[in-house]
Amino acid sequence: MTSPESSSAAGSGDRAVAAAAERAKLTAGRNIPSFDDLPLPADTANLREGADLSDALLALLPLVGVWRGEGEGRGHDGDYRFGQQIVVSHDGGDYLNWEARSWRLNETGDYQERGLRETGFWRFVRDPDDPSESQAIELLLAHSAGYVELFYGRPRTQSSWELVTDALARSRSGVLVGGAKRLYGIVEGGDLAYVEERVDADGGLVPHLSARLSRFAG
């Protein structure tokens, strides 16, 4: 006999699947714009279009798409809310393109000012001499605040990934920041959620950013 709890859980799961199917009707036909006069494969954020995803990236397949939503941040001036768009695309190569743009929101949830912005690439480590590294991930990022960062990590599950800063370099005009730890995951309803902690002036990891983003394209 099915318990009320399991029936409720099953119903919740069914609703989540139905909601995801409805969203897919909208997102499946969307992609990022591209120029069609270049001689190489175009970037695509939709796995239904463009070049096939490299076999080397199959463990990152759920990330591909355009994601939009809101999150919470903690800065020198206190806590704040932000909107964000993340674009994860590929051109058939052995890397994913990554671009994240955010903007601060005011108390009514409207745009207030530009926020953090970063661009870079996800890659898998290839080391024939060390098979244990075959699932290691590199995330190379350039931040608009004036620093570049290399994250290193591994998949935790088929739909979650954990990374920590391995190296960080600041430009002469860049902000002072510490290393970070990030956890990304596909959560209920197919959303992309993440949390980031950064090292503060006392040398400890403290909450910095968190967000939950819904698929907009792909």
From Swiss-Prot:
Residues at which heme b binds: K181, H208
Please write the reaction equations for the catalytic activity of this protein: peroxynitrite = nitrate
State which Enzyme Commission number(s) the record gives.
Answer: 5.99.-.-
Cofactor note, please?
A: Binds 1 heme b group per subunit, that coordinates a highly solvent-exposed Fe(III) atom.
| UniProt KW Heme keyword | yes
InterPro entries (alphabetical): Calycin (IPR012674), Nb(III)_bact/plant (IPR022939), Nitrobindin (IPR045165), THAP4-like_heme-bd (IPR014878)
UniProt GO molecular function: heme binding; metal ion binding; peroxynitrite isomerase activity
**Which Pfam family would be a valid example here?**
THAP4_heme-bd
Q: What's in the keyword line of the UniProt record?
A: Heme, Iron, Isomerase, Metal-binding
What pathway annotation does it carry?
Nitrogen metabolism
The record places the motif (GXWXGXG) at: 65-71
Cofactors: heme b
> What HAMAP family does this protein map onto?
nitrobindin
Q: Oligomeric state and partners?
A: Homodimer.
Comment on protein domains: Forms a 10-stranded antiparallel beta-barrel structure able to accommodate a hydrophobic ligand in its interior. In fact, this fold hosts the heme group, which is located in a wide surface cleft.
The UniProt function text for this chain reads: Heme-binding protein able to scavenge peroxynitrite and to protect free L-tyrosine against peroxynitrite-mediated nitration, by acting as a peroxynitrite isomerase that converts peroxynitrite to nitrate. Therefore, this protein likely plays a role in peroxynitrite sensing and in the detoxification of reactive nitrogen and oxygen species (RNS and ROS, respectively). Is able to bind nitric oxide (NO) in vitro, but may act as a sensor of peroxynitrite levels in vivo.
The entry assigns this protein to a family as follows:
Belongs to the nitrobindin family.
- What name appears for this protein in its UniProt entry? Peroxynitrite isomerase 1
Q: What is the species listed in this Swiss-Prot or TrEMBL entry?
A: Mycobacterium avium (strain 104)
